Structure formats: C-alpha cells, structure tokens
C-alpha cells in the first residue's frame, strides 16, 4: 500500500516521502499537471499519508483514518471544486472560515482545491488572504492544469510540484503487474500517453466501454447515420459544461486514436503499430469508407478541437464544429 501504488512521477513520490519522513510538510502545495497525470490521486494519497495513524513515510491503508478517507467520510479532508465555470467568492469566504476550525479527528485539516486556475480576480484575491494568514493546523493542496492562469502571488506561497504523464513503459509494467495480458497492457499504455484519465485512475472497464462507444460514434458519423441522435446526446450533455468538456475531451481523444489506426492501415495493412488491434477488422471496413485525405482532414480537425477546448469556446460551437467535421455540411439546429 502507499504512494508507490500510483503510476509514474517517481521523482515526486520521493519528494512526498521525504516530507513525510522528516515531518516537514508545507502548509500549501500546488500540484500542476494534466488530469491524466492523476494529480487528484496523488493529492488524496498524500493527504491520506498525513492523516494515517500508523505512518512512517507513507499511509498504511488499513487504519481507521485511511479507511474513512477511502470511503470519503473523513471529516478533516475536504475536496473543493468550483461551483460553475469559476469559483465564487462566497466559496472562498466559507473556506476561510472553515480554515480556522480545529481538526475533528485528524492531525490536520486538509483542503484539496481542484481546478485552482478557475478562480477569477475576486475569488483569487480572497483565497490569497487565506494563504497569507494560514491556521497552524490547516494545509492546502491546490491542483491546476495551467500554472499560467494562477496569480503569481498565490504561486509564490505554494510549494509547486510539476507532474508529467506516465511513460508507456511505466503504464505497461503497472498493468502487466496486475495480471493484464501484454497486448491489452500495451493498448492501455498508448491510451495513457494520449491523456486518457481513466488509465492512470485504473478504471480499465470504464475506459474499454468508452472506447467501444467512441468506435460506434465513428461508424455512425462515417456512414452519416443517426447523426441527429449523436447531436441530441451531445446537446444534452452540454447542460453541465464541466462534465461535458470532460466527456468531449475523452471522446475527441479516443476518436483521434481510432483515426490514427485507420491512417496506418491505409499505409500498410499489416502494420505492427495499430493501437486498437482488437478492432482491426472494423477499422479495415472503415478504411474503405474513409479515404486517406478524409482521415488526414479529420485528424487535423480533432487537433483543432483540442485547441478550442483549451480556449473555453462555447459548448454549442464545439458541438457544431465536431459534427461538421464528419458530415461536411452545416447543422442548423444545434
């Protein structure tokens, strides 16, 4: 049990172990990296190690505190997310008040602040005051995908750790160690390198189902069948912007990998570099429907969509551009 069960970022694991071993834990830390680097998983594991009743430089996983954290009922670990597109000033004011309350059962009161880059000027300035006047028994772990969107004064008060995506070798070794066959472990390692969050969170069954649904969407879009059904589903999901963007990013990512394989099959039918090898027969059929020029165009369009997601474009615009990429016609009823 412990931090070492997480995939990748061994340098950061060593740093966290050192903090725990020397009992020299910063009161505010900033974990920077893509969601697929599993910053949330590392933050929870580090918080668990701090609160563990039987720790040396890691958590035991079996004490009462560890079990309560796993069940998400531990009173002195709180994970905070923005209410809407940005954090509201009222959220930060409540956090400031809670910051001064003593821990109920834990060694510290720990706040994990997800998407810290989503603080606007008002909420960021309010949070800065919290960091400037920390309570002795409180700790903050901020998570961000983009360091550049945080106030320099907030960054200067945090110990910053920069996370990277696990390497294909780390991912493959991890999954083979769990008894997964080499071919599937290799597939998962490719998906993890493409930024698929489920891989590093070890949600393999969920990922396989998402991949199957992505292939189904690609088939329907290529055949121009059930496009209205896909459009309706995307519009329904877009009612919750954050959840939609999470889903849409994964969909675009998985479609890009499927298109990459079709492109390779155009070049060489027996290519040994196919990622979705278990779908090869279906991808061969899609190759007949999607000429190389169309595949290259779609790969390019998916790259543009990734950029547009980062630019926080309106969800309706993202959906429109996505559908137009495959149908090559205007969709007026988005």
What function would you assign to each model-found segment?
Residues 97, 129, 156:
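Conserved adenine-binding aromatic site and its adjacent loop/helix in ATP-hydrolyzing domains
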Residues 100, 125-142:
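Conserved catalytic/switch belt of AAA+ P-loop NTPases
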Residues 114-120, 125-132, 148:
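Catalytic acidic motif of RecA-like/P-loop NTPases
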Residues 2-122:
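Clamp-loader machinery-focused feature within the broader ASCE/P-loop NTPase space
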Residues 1-49, 65-68, 136-138, 146-254, ...:
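Charged, glycine-rich active-site and insertion segments that engage polyanionic ligands
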Residues 79-81, 142, 160-162:
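Structural signal for conserved beta-strand scaffold positions within catalytic alpha/beta enzyme cores
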């Amino acid at each position: 049990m412990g931090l070492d069960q997480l995939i990748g970022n061994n340098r950061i694991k060593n740093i966290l172990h050192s903090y725990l071993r020397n009992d020299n834990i910063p009161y505010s830390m900033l974990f920077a990296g893509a969601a697929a680097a599993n910053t949330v998983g590392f933050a929870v594991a580090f918080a668990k190690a701090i609160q563990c009743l039987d720790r040396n430089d890691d958590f035991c996983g079996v004490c009462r505190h560890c079990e309560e954290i796993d069940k998400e009922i531990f009173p002195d670990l709180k994970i905070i997310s923005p209410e809407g597109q940005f954090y509201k000033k009222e959220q930060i004011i409540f956090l400031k008040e809670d910051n001064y309350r003593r821990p109920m059962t834990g060694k510290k009161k720990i706040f994990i602040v997800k998407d810290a880059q989503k603080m606007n000027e008002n909420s960021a300035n309010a949070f800065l005051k919290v960091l400037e006047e920390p309570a002795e028994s409180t700790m903050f772990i901020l998570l961000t995908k983009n360091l550049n969107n945080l106030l320099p004064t907030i960054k200067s008060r945090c110990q910053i750790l920069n996370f990277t995506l696990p390497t294909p070798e780390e991912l493959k070794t991890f999954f083979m160690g769990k008894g997964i066959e080499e071919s599937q472990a290799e597939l998962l390692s490719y998906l993890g390198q493409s930024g698929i969050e489920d891989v590093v969170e070890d949600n393999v069954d969920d990922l396989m189902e998402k991949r199957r649904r992505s292939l189904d969407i690609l088939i329907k879009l290529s055949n121009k069948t059930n496009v209205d059904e896909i459009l309706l589903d995307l519009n329904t999901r877009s009612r919750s912007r954050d959840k939609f963007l999470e889903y849409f990013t994964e969909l675009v990512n998985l479609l890009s990998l499927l298109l990459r394989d079709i492109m390779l099959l155009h070049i060489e039918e027996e290519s040994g570099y196919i990622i979705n090898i278990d779908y090869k027969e279906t991808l061969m059929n899609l190759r007949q429907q999607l000429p190389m020029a169309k595949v290259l165009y779609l790969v390019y369009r998916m790259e543009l969509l990734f950029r547009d997601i980062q630019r926080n474009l309106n969800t309706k615009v993202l959906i429109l551009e996505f559908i137009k990429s495959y149908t090559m016609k205007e969709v007026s009823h988005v």
